[in-house]
């Protein structure tokens, strides 16, 4: 995109154009506000790619892999609408494996209460983190499917992609 003359900005924990800890509500709120401040006339697209793997705590996995992406997308949706932009959410090919807990997927997508979801995550043992990872990514993909018709009414496209293992700082 940059090679084509487009401006690309990123939100990252360290070293991004906008620095924010997206695993916290304060970080998500600050990131959304920073994008609004910089691009009040709208944005062409959003790629929500933040996440942590199964070595993180269950709470951090749910906070970053599920809630942060949704809150960014919803918080920036009006900016996307101004330019009829699109949103891509990064899910994972792990959503098809045996570690997905459909009860957790249902809880995340139906409850939509971040505080209660994170309370559940705090009660889970670290040994459940692989299931937390795949379940959070499955829930994110399900959320995208649920909201895509409403986004389409506004002329917006939203989709989830499920790449395989990709060389990122998380996988190195």
Where are these regions (language model features)?
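Canonical Rossmann dinucleotide-binding motif of NAD(H)/NADP(H)-dependent dehydrogenases/reductases
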Residues: 1-9
């Amino acid at each position: 995109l940059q090679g084509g003359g487009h401006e690309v900005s990123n939100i990252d924990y360290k070293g991004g154009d906008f620095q924010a800890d997206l695993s916290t509500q304060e970080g998500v709120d600050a990131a959304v506000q920073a994008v609004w401040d910089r691009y009040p006339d709208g944005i062409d697209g959003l790629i929500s790619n933040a996440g942590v793997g199964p070595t993180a705590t269950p709470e951090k996995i749910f906070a970053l892999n599920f809630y942060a992406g949704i809150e960014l997308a919803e918080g920036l949706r009006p900016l996307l609408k101004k330019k009829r932009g699109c949103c891509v959410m990064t899910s994972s090919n792990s959503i098809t494996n045996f570690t997905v807990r459909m009860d957790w997927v249902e809880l995340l997508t139906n409850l939509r209460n971040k505080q209660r979801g994170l309370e559940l995550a705090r009660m889970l043992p670290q040994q459940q983190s692989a299931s937390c990872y795949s379940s959070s990514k499955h829930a994110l993909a399900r959320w995208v499917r649920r909201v895509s018709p409403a986004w389409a009414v506004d002329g917006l496209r939203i989709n989830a992609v499920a790449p395989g293992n990709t060389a990122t700082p998380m996988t190195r």
